[in-house]
Amino acid sequence: VTNKNPGTTDPDFYDYLILGSGAGGCAAAHRLAQTGRRVLLLERGKELPRDGPTTAVDPVLRRRDFHSTEPFHFSATAARNDEFENLGGKTKWYGASLLRFTAEEFLADESHQCPPWPCTAAEFQHSYGEAERLLGVRHFPVERDLRTLLDRLHRTDPAWQEEPQPLGLLPEIGNDDEVRRFDGFTLISDHKADAENRLLAPIRHLPNVTILTETTVKDLLPEAGDSIRLGGVRCADGRIFRASSILLGAGAMHSCRLLARYVQRHELAAALPAPELIGRYFKYHIGSLILAISPRAYSDRLRKTISLLHPEFPHSIVQSSAWIDGELIGARLPAWLPRFAIDALGRHAYAFLLMTEDGSHRDNRVTELPDGGIALAYDHELVRPAIQEHQRLRENFSRTLLRAGYFPLRKRIARYSTSHASGTLVATANPQGSVVDSYGRVLGLKNLRVVDASVFPRIGRGNPALTVFAWALRVAEDLAGETVNSGLVTHLNSA
């Protein structure tokens, strides 16, 4: 690929080319669009329909109409692919829980197998604030049933600490039936802040912004005569797009495979400080769901308002989860079970999500199947501290609920679930042990950056979505400044 001058009128040349429209891709596009330079965002999936199926249990949970069909193997065995392919990425389906990492979660914790970030919490504050502003993050009041449950919980074990759960929801959602189907579903309205409606919608009308869906990128391409500098991308349909800067935002399961292909094809291992780490250090959350069953039916509607912390479990969090009912519970149970019993269970169930930060191990990794699908090699035995803490968390919270008068029903989240995947293009405080630096630059290459959770050396104990938004804004801000400075130098030299 031979790139022309950035001032070219070539319709297939862009200043910034972003791969993926999840939290990172959309945040980067939002910031870079403000430069006035040409931005192209490519998304392999479609724009989701707004006529109802994304809020219905059958198409979403039973038929899995919106999940990726790409082959996926977990520990060498074919497994269900939990990835989504759509404009807005996983943020269209998330529960809008938008927590900041604590200052400690940016630091190393060797006992939990956690390396440090390449930047501090203080360096993230501006980006966190900007992300929260764009997403309209707010707290919601605790409803009556949950207040009763929490009071009983505190009386049983005062060590449980309560914090409001920051949410990207509009207040109107509390007065709408959508409150029952916002977590794990995509809303027809914009009551839930996601990457598309908060970050793409305000810029998609701009003349310098192009968004293409159903466009699968197969290969990164080099600049002619210089494979250290990328020139563009080749898509599955043969189209080629060129750009001055390329940003990977395809997610931790995909961005690493694109980079691995490029480095291998162009024999660039010697140019990168740690090419062997591409795809390694995969991590996610060790998770469980516990239903607190009460003799009395619950009437709370929003429910997802509180986080619980305990000093005995410093890498873990318990969050009150969104509405649950018989239809949701039944989607995961055999069809022969009587519906009236499942509906009764749903009326008496309050859901809690338990998450523990995963540790890092180089042998937990993502590679490519021979047919182009995803291969995830992951062994819980390699991250024993995380597994052990989560087991103790489950036992403690279940026991506390039981003593408080609630019967706990427990379900472990599937090991092959990749909803919070991260770490496969790791950035740490040690450049020689990193693929990416503190501003998303792929070390050893000239114009490739990463704006998704692939870079995370730690995932924290809560949902990492806000940190992905903030990271991408930080990277895009730096890239925009770099572009401005480069343009100024060029102007002065030609004057």
Over which residues does each language-model region extend?
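Extreme N-terminal leader/targeting segments of oxidoreductases
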Residues: 1-16, 34-35, 481-495
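Glycine-rich Rossmann-fold phosphate-binding loop(s) that bind the pyrophosphate
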Residues: 20-22, 44, 250, 453
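Redox-cofactor-proximal catalytic regions of oxidoreductases
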Residues: 61-142, 353-362, 367
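Glycine-rich loop(s) and the adjacent beta-strand/alpha-helix scaffold that form part
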Residues: 34, 45-50, 54-55, 215, ...
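N-terminal Rossmann-like FAD-binding beta1-loop-alpha1 element of flavoenzymes
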Residues: 16-41
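FAD cofactor-binding and catalytic pocket of flavoenzymes
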Residues: 81, 275-382, 421, 433, ...
